[in-house]
Amino acid sequence: MNIILEILLLLITIIYSYLESLVKFFIPQRRKSVAGEIVLITGAGHGIGRQTTYEFAKRQSILVLWDINKRGVEETAAECRKLGVTAHAYVVDCSNREEIYRSLNQVKKEVGDVTIVVNNAGTVYPADLLSTKDEEITKTFEVNILGHFWITKALLPSMMERNHGHIVTVASVCGHEGIPYLIPYCSSKFAAVGFHRGLTSELQALGKTGIKTSCLCPVFVNTGFTKNPSTRLWPVLETDEVVRSLIDGILTNKKMIFVPSYINIFLRLQKFLPERASAILNRMQNIQFEAVVGHKIKMK
């Protein structure tokens, strides 16, 4: 195609996309049904994973629940069964590739082909870099991003065969902005955002438009992962608020889900700020939580 025509098409697409977004802002979008879908949720024994499981249970999905905590995942499954849905609980270490593949083979035999996966399992070690142990850095990447690769690689073939599925990546605003004393966590979440964007582009290039992708990026969430979090500019979110946005995003096939939604505007504007101004803005946020600094626990 002639380069001038391509540029013209690009401009038309940009204008159309903005107009479409404006219309969607005022007109509620149609939500898809997830009834009967086989949904795998990792980290389902607590926090965002548990609440997300309950929302899928309310919508009559078939649930496959993973967590390293046996008691937590079985409690979640029991609550879902009270809602009249089928829930299968598995104890799985999402940092162990062989265990992931073995468990997925078991799920395929016992339940069927997973059609929606929520890669939610995560871990964090708040500390300055020099106080962070090597094995903690390794574990952070194994759980927060490498597990996404192994799970998605194993599930994609059946999704691609049917051109149907949904892959959800639970990341964080920390995947867009570096935070002191969370270097391994931020790095793993940057990787998770990149995984989502790359996978989205690859599926489009392959013509697999029936496989949807979503990426959740909340600010600090009160799940207990980081102790006593606080910020000056952003709220510390409760789990139910985050999950409402996540479920709404999944049901409307939204690609990037920021919570709160206006954080996206902040991140976009920050890219245009001079480095000094950006540093001042970061200080204004006054992000605090308990972290190990110099091998001592301090508020940072």
From Swiss-Prot:
Keyword NAD found:
yes
Q: Give the modified residues of type Phosphoserine.
A: 33
Name the consequence of residue 189 to A: Loss of retinol/retinal dehydrogenase activity
Extract the GO molecular function terms from the UniProt entry.
all-trans-retinol dehydrogenase (NAD+) activity; estradiol 17-beta-dehydrogenase [NAD(P)+] activity; oxidoreductase activity, acting on the CH-OH group of donors, NAD or NADP as acceptor; steroid dehydrogenase activity
Residues annotated as the enzyme's active site: 185 (proton acceptor)
Stated consequence of mutating residue 101 to A:
Decreased retinol/retinal dehydrogenase activity
- Which residues are noted in the entry as NAD(+)-binding? 40-67, 189
A Pfam family found in this protein is adh_short
Q: What is this protein called?
A: 17-beta-hydroxysteroid dehydrogenase 13
What species does this protein belong to? Homo sapiens
Biological classification of the source: Eukaryota, Metazoa, Chordata, Craniata, Vertebrata
